[in-house]
């Protein structure tokens, strides 16, 4: 199945080297390359008797020393909560992230992030020490998680991360890329895995055992076991057993008949459901225009055009789209490419596709999701009427009572855009335009406050406003204001009566210099310079962002 493929060496006990996603690198002589786009996890303990398959090519003392530094820290800590850095010396982190501790300073750890290589200090109270000297307790959690897996599924399965690129040479093999996550379905003689990629179409197909590392989802650690132990621990089926289980599952869930009959049945059901919809509310066009971050959760701005001339602006999360995809694939198996005809040929898939959820979402992932979702909803609208007008699809685009969704006449939206475009001299014209989904700005990252900006700034200008801020903001109430300095983002809690001098005194300790200027932060760059108390009051009232620049 793979020419010149050799399994990794094992020690006298038959144990392979323990490796984690921190050790992932492309198969080359240079072990210094770092895969930056994947989240790494520390290893419980490292076997000194063996190394990964490709790593055996370079075993100089220097490299071995470096490997020890990376994978064998004296102390490993795990974040219990998320935290945003308040100074340039601190590190920001998300709940569940691991750090290596290099020093201890009263209430702070001096730590490094193995995923990014950044070093800094983190508050002790936000972390728990991960004790790697007690494998029994970790194994106990492994056993517990595996028991749950076996109880919930008829056949065992594993989760793995690809260590090296693998190019398929036969039709039954699966091409994989370093850093990819795989779902392991079965094995062949403990030398090959039947795997499916998570996050893209493809598979199932054969992947060499030595090209992946098995990860325990319950702990986030590489299991560190011999591959045979991992296979036995979850009763991973052989290829033949796996095929038999799949066949039995299909036989018990799909009635006999041709694809045409299945299609006719699936057409009849949705038509009955879509009969409830009003013709004037049929969806004509949909697009995903931008995304935002609110309460540490990303969401997407969806624009819909209806056949009655109205427009909708909707706030949706990625899980909403994915749940719909799962429902549609289950309700329309023929259109999903899951049925065979009498000749054994699979039906043609016409359903659009989006990748499944991932455990850790970043800004770059969300940008890619925004592009994928924009294509997904456009394809969804163009599906046959019995799908696109079904109740399932309709439910995604209805106006919800979430404080954001709204429906209005299309002419009203055009007038809003025209007014904003004519107001080029207004300080916040660019920001106001961005609150409309027709904005042409390239930066599609919005926050909840940004999308309310048009209402709050209808008569507001930093330099031109003579109206004093509302009395309620000058009291004890505080407002969170973000400021951006170089590559860092900071948050300040400011009272409504905060002065320009007080604002500078709060910012100065968090940056590298005492010589700096303040400007409003717009979506396409920096705006007006902030110099007066009234400008600061207006910023707090409108919950704007501040950009800090060295002079």
Swiss-Prot record:
UniProt modified residues of type Phosphoserine: 47, 255, 258, 458, 461
Primary location: cytoplasm
Composition bias, Basic and acidic residues: 55-73
Entry keyword annotation includes Cytoplasm: yes
InterPro entries documented for this protein: Bem1/Scd2_PX, Bem1/Scd2_SH3_1, Bem1/Scd2_SH3_2, NADPH_Oxidase/PX-Domain, PB1-like, PB1_dom, PX_dom, PX_dom_sf
A Pfam family reported for this protein in Swiss-Prot or TrEMBL: SH3_1
Record-annotated SH3 domain positions: 72-132, 155-217
Domain PB1: start-end pairs: 478-551
Coiled coil: none
Single Gene Ontology BP annotation: regulation of Rho protein signal transduction
Compositionally biased residues, Polar residues: 22-31
Modified residues (N-acetylmethionine): 1
Annotated function: Necessary for cell polarization during vegetative growth. May link the cytoskeleton to morphogenic determinants on the cell surface.
Assembly behavior: Interacts with AXL2 and BUD5.
This protein's name: Bud emergence protein 1
Source organism of the structure: Saccharomyces cerevisiae (strain ATCC 204508 / S288c)
Gene: BEM1
């Amino acid at each position: 199945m793979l020419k010149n493929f050799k399994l990794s060496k094992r020690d006298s006990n038959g144990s392979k080297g323990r490796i984690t996603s921190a050790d992932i690198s492309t198969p080359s002589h240079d072990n210094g390359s770092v895969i930056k786009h994947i989240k790494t996890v520390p290893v419980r303990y490292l076997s000194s008797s063996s190394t990964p398959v490709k790593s055996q090519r370079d075993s100089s003392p220097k490299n071995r020393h470096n490997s020890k530094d990376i994978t064998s820290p004296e102390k490993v800590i795990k974040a219990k909560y998320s935290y945003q850095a308040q100074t340039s010396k601190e590190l920001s982190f998300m709940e569940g992230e691991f750090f290596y501790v290099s020093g201890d300073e009263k209430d702070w750890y001096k730590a490094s992030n193995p995923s990014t290589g950044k070093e800094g200090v983190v508050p002790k109270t936000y972390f728990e020490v991960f004790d790697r000297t007690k494998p029994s307790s970790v194994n106990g959690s492994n056993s517990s998680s595996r028991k749950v897996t076996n109880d919930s599924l008829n056949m065992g399965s594993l989760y793995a991360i690809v260590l090296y690129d693998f190019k398929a040479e036969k039709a039954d093999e699966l091409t994989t890329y370093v850093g990819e996550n795989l779902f392991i379905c079965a094995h062949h003689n403990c030398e090959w895995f039947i795997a499916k990629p998570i996050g893209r179409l493809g598979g199932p197909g054969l992947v060499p055992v030595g090209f992946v590392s098995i990860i325990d989802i319950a702990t986030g650690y590489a299991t560190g076991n011999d591959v045979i132990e991992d296979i036995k621990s979850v009763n991973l089926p052989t290829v033949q057993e796996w095929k038999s289980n799949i066949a039995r599952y299909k036989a018990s869930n799909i009635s006999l008949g041709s694809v045409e009959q299945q299609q006719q049945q699936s057409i009849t059901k949705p038509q009955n459901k879509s009969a409830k919809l009003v013709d004037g509310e049929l969806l004509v066009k949909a697009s995903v225009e931008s995304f935002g971050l609110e309460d540490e959760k990303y969401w997407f701005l969806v624009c819909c055009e209806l056949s009655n001339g109205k427009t909708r602006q909707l706030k949706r999360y990625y899980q909403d789209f994915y749940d719909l995809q799962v429902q549609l694939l289950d309700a329309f198996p023929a259109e999903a490419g899951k049925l065979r005809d009498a000749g054994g040929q699979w039906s043609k898939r016409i359903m659009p596709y989006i990748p499944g959820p991932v455990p850790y979402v970043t800004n770059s992932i969300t940008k890619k999701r925004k592009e994928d979702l924009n294509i997904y909803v456009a394809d969804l609208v163009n599906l046959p009427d019995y799908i696109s007008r079904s109740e399932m699809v309709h439910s995604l685009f209805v106006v919800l009572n979430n404080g954001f969704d709204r429906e209005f006449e299309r002419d009203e939206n055009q007038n809003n855009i025209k007014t904003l475009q004519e107001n080029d001299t207004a300080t916040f014209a660019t920001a106001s335009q961005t609150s409309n989904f027709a904005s042409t700005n390239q930066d599609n990252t919005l926050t909840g406050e940004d999308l309310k900006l048009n209402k709050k700034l209808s008569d507001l200008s930093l330099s031109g406003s003579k109206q004093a801020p509302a009395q309620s903001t000058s009291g004890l109430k505080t407002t969170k204001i973000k400021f951006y300095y170089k590559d860092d983002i900071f948050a300040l809690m400011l009272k409504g009566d905060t002065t320009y001098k007080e604002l500078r005194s709060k910012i100065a300790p968090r940056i590298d210099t005492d010589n700096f200027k303040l400007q409003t932060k717009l979506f396409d760059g920096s705006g007006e310079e902030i110099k007066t108390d009234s400008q600061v009051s207006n910023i707090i009232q409108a919950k704007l962002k501040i950009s800090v620049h060295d002079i």
